[in-house]
Swiss-Prot record:
It comes from Rhodopseudomonas palustris (strain ATCC BAA-98 / CGA009). The gene is engB. InterPro entries: G_ENGB_dom, GTP-bd, GTP-bd_ribosome_bio_YsxC, P-loop_NTPase. This is Probable GTP-binding protein EngB. One of its GO terms (cellular component) is cytosol. One of its GO terms (biological process) is division septum assembly. NCBIfam families: GTPase_YsxC.
Amino acid sequence: MTDAIDPDLIERGRKMFAGDWHFIWASPSIETLPPMGSVEIAFAGRSNVGKSSLINALTGRNALARTSHTPGRTQELIFFEGPPNAGLRLVDMPGYGYAAASKAKVASWTSLIHHFLQGRATLARVYVLIDGRHGLKDVDLDILKTLDKAAVSYQIVLTKADQVKAAELAERVTATVAALAKHPAAFPEVLTTSSRTGAGMPELRAAMIRLLDERR
């Protein structure tokens, strides 16, 4: 699923995410975005795919990002910042694909996300979270097209890997990699994670360290 990652990147990722991570900003509209500064890495995905749980698992803080059992509850861009020497912000994006949301609300979220993606020079990558039990859906493919148009680098992360048999997960990774061949802005490697067991978190942290190194 992933090639062997440099142990130094794994260790640097562990140290950075063991530091003090905290909430800094919530933006319900493009006009209320925080000033650009640190490198930003955003997390997108369908409602209840596990974005908040993944951010909590990454940082080792159970309550940093609020999790909700109500799909579509996160309606803002939520910014978190790490230790001063990290130079990194994490952005929890509004969940998409919640059928019960009103058309006006969906339009508002869509506008916010599109403007954020197209006008944020500090945005290094978007991790698009896909439920590992189900794989890519049409609504996910729509988001990938949006990212392609915005020329924003993105990578797929299959979540809830602990709830899928190993052989089935491997097949899902292969199918996802094949689908990404049609998307020019997609990073060709697919990551798998479990917020419950911590599987895949060291590799995801290491990938972020590598991104930071590339931006410096």
